[in-house]
A protein has these predicted regions:
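Solvent-exposed, flexible loop/coil residues
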Residues: 5, 104, 119
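Short cysteine-rich clusters marking metal-coordination/redox-active sites
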Residues: 103-106, 124-127
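A broad detector of the eukaryotic-type serine/threonine protein kinase catalytic domain
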Residues: 93, 108-111
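Short functional micro-motifs and their immediate structural scaffolds
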Residues: 100, 110-112, 129-132
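Short Cys/His-rich "knuckle" micro-motifs
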Residues: 113-118
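Interaction interfaces in information-processing and related assembly proteins
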Residues: 1-97
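Short metal-coordination and nucleic-acid-contact micro-motifs, chiefly zinc-binding Cys/His arrays
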Residues: 96-99, 120-123
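Short alpha-helical
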Residues: 36, 110, 122-123
Length: 133
């Protein structure tokens, strides 16, 4: 006899989703991505602060016009990297909670192929298309 949840029957060794919470390959993949993204965020944030300090020391005391563009690009890259880091942290939390691999929209299973391509995926391909992701 299988137990049921609002998502359907519980399956797998941990009954937590299409990807068992204890499956080390997914945790290792996400942790590797987390470390790389943390390093990237750290480097970008340091580079931004160094560039901003250099701009403040520049002539005129302002960073207007052309001099502001590199700072803005660096800031955008930093923000994007922080979002990616947060996505990876959320995927790790879902894995620990047994929710990794379940679509947050339709509650259906996210195929392992999609997770392999996009380990932080929160939505199945159909729901992601509907959300414009």
């Amino acid at each position: 006899m299988q137990a049921e949840t609002s998502r359907g029957p519980l399956t797998g060794p941990d009954a937590g989703g299409p990807v068992p919470a204890g499956e080390p390959q997914w945790r290792a993949l996400l942790e590797t991505r987390w470390r790389a993204r943390l390093q990237e965020v750290t480097e970008l944030a340091l580079a931004y602060h160094e560039a901003a300090a250099a701009a403040d020391r520049g002539t005129g005391g302002g960073a207007g016009g052309r001099r502001a563009q590199p700072l803005l690009r660096l800031l955008r890259r930093t923000v994007t990297s922080r979002r990616a880091l947060a996505d990876t942290e959320e995927a790790l939390a879902r894995l620990s909670a047994g929710r990794y691999g379940w679509c947050e929209s339709c509650a259906g299973a996210i195929p392992a192929q999609r997770l392999a391509a996009t380990p932080e995926a929160r939505y199945c391909a159909r729901c992601a298309r509907g959300r414009g992701r």
